[in-house]
Amino acid sequence: MAKKTDTRIVINMACTDCGERNYTTEKNKRNDPRRIELNKYCPRCREAKVHRETK
């Protein structure tokens, strides 16, 4: 069986324009040591904007 390790952490994604935290996802700390930036849909802005990982 696979062993559960602490390589994956849960992060929040916040819109860079309005600052609302819209998405929750997991990331692997080894593969992505820096903050993730993804283009996602923001319901408050009503369009696709860049979402950045928050602490």
Curated annotation (Swiss-Prot):
GO terms of molecular function: structural constituent of ribosome
Originating species: Dehalococcoides mccartyi (strain ATCC BAA-2266 / KCTC 15142 / 195)
Alphabetized UniProt keyword annotations: Ribonucleoprotein, Ribosomal protein
Any single biological process term in GO: translation
Keyword RNA-binding assigned: no
PROSITE patterns given in the database record: RIBOSOMAL_L33 (PS00582)
InterPro entries according to UniProt: Ribosomal_bL33, Ribosomal_bL33_CS, Ribosomal_bL33_sf, Ribosomal_zn-bd
Protein name: Large ribosomal subunit protein bL33
Family in the record: Belongs to the bacterial ribosomal protein bL33 family.
Annotated Gene Ontology cellular component terms: cytoplasm; ribonucleoprotein complex; ribosome
SUPFAM superfamilies, sorted: Zn-binding ribosomal proteins
Taxonomic lineage: Bacteria, Bacillati, Chloroflexota, Dehalococcoidia, Dehalococcoidales
Gene that this polypeptide is encoded by: rpmG
